[in-house]
């Protein structure tokens, strides 16, 4: 399988992006060991929009790695998506899916990447309970409900989601070794050996 790893972490204020870089490298090493072909982009290092469109077209799967900042992605990853997805007009998506005959239906169905998948791997200082418990901060919406707009941006291109991986409590109660092992297991479960 051809997999594009996009590291959306960035250095800003007290965040240095080290843990997300670690997880990005765990994914790269694990997937290569499983026999998959990997390309990568580190958003904070810069990118060429047209090259990124080609990478997305090349990939069967995109794995996004990023920290949860103010309930979403770091701004450079959002900018990446705005710039690269827009540059991909005609290749990543044809239109918004609607027709003039029925302009209220089929919005978001103009994507061209129907055979592609994407996966989110994200880190949060929030504990898992903040996402899962009704009455807690995210009111039981779970991580995927919290990330609805990120999912919809990828689904607008026609891609389908793979199971999300989330590491919680990364500042107040970090457990890096446990998280790394859990991520390796997740990658093995989702992707398995390329030769299987």
Curated annotation (Swiss-Prot):
Judging by the UniProt lineage, the source's domain of life is Eukaryota
Gene Ontology molecular function: catalytic activity; flavin adenine dinucleotide binding
**Required cofactor names:** FAD
Q: Name one GO cellular component term.
A: nucleus
Arranged from A to Z, the UniProt key words for this protein are: FAD, Flavoprotein
Binding of FAD, residues? 15-22, 68-71, 107, 123-126
Return the similarity comment. Answer: Belongs to the oxidoreductase MdaB family.
Official protein name in the record? Uncharacterized protein C5H10.05c
Q: Which organism is it from?
A: Schizosaccharomyces pombe (strain 972 / ATCC 24843)
Lineage here is:
Eukaryota, Fungi, Dikarya, Ascomycota, Taphrinomycotina
